């Protein structure tokens, strides 16, 4: 499971002209799921995302988590995070999980985040053509892969 975590001052998701998510200070999390992903991957990423100290404290030192600053989270599914660009110029998405596996994993990921966070997680719509608007704060952008835990 791969995620891109972006610290934002504002973010929203629009599908077919309707806003499905809208936050101010918080995190925008893009998530890509592959067939080898398990609940263990979800649990590891959930703990990291909720506790990651990437918000400034009173001295503007990154010592605070999204919980500490009473921020919000938007999660957006993005199969293109598993693109392979090794061969040719057209990315291959063969490593991305098919919807029958990816949708339940995505839903479990969101539920796990909500449980750990103690707040509702806003989302896009899985598989939809989404317009994601964000104001990246910093910028602070973190890439994590549960299969390559660094």
UniProtKB/Swiss-Prot annotation:
It is an enzyme of class 3 (hydrolase). A Gly-cisPro motif from one monomer fits into the active site of the other monomer to allow specific chiral rejection of L-amino acids. The keyword Cytoplasm applies. One of its GO terms (molecular function) is tRNA binding. It catalyses: glycyl-tRNA(Ala) + H2O = tRNA(Ala) + glycine + H(+); a D-aminoacyl-tRNA + H2O = a tRNA + a D-alpha-amino acid + H(+). Keywords: Cytoplasm, Hydrolase, RNA-binding, tRNA-binding. It holds the Pfam family Tyr_Deacylase. It is found in: Cytoplasm. An aminoacyl-tRNA editing enzyme that deacylates mischarged D-aminoacyl-tRNAs. Also deacylates mischarged glycyl-tRNA(Ala), protecting cells against glycine mischarging by AlaRS. Acts via tRNA-based rather than protein-based catalysis; rejects L-amino acids rather than detecting D-amino acids in the active site. By recycling D-aminoacyl-tRNA to D-amino acids and free tRNA molecules, this enzyme counteracts the toxicity associated with the formation of D-aminoacyl-tRNA entities in vivo and helps enforce protein L-homochirality. This is D-aminoacyl-tRNA deacylase. One of its GO terms (cellular component) is cytoplasm. The gene is dtd. Homodimer. SUPFAM superfamilies: DTD-like (SSF69500). InterPro entries: Daa-tRNA_deacyls_DTD, DTD-like_sf. It comes from Flavobacterium johnsoniae (strain ATCC 17061 / DSM 2064 / JCM 8514 / BCRC 14874 / CCUG 350202 / NBRC 14942 / NCIMB 11054 / UW101) (Cytophaga johnsonae). A motif (Gly-cisPro motif, important for rejection of L-amino acids) lies at residues 138-139. Its EC number is 3.1.1.96. GO terms for biological process: D-amino acid catabolic process. It comes from the Bacteria. Belongs to the DTD family. The keyword Hydrolase applies.
């Amino acid at each position: 499971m791969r995620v891109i975590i972006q610290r934002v001052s504002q973010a929203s998701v629009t599908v077919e002209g309707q806003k499905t998510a809208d936050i101010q200070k918080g995190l925008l999390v893009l998530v890509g799921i592959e067939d080898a992903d398990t609940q263990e991957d979800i649990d590891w990423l959930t703990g990291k995302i909720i506790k990651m100290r990437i918000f400034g404290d009173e001295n503007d030192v990154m010592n605070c988590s999204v919980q500490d600053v009473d921020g919000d989270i938007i999660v957006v599914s993005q199969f293109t995070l598993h693109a392979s660009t090794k061969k040719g110029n057209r990315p291959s998405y063969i490593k991305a999980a098919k919807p029958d596996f990816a949708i339940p994993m995505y839903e479990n990921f969101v539920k796990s985040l909500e449980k750990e966070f103690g707040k509702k997680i806003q989302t896009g719509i899985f598989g939809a053509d989404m317009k994601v608007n964000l104001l990246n704060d910093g910028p602070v952008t973190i890439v994590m892969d549960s299969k390559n835990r660094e």
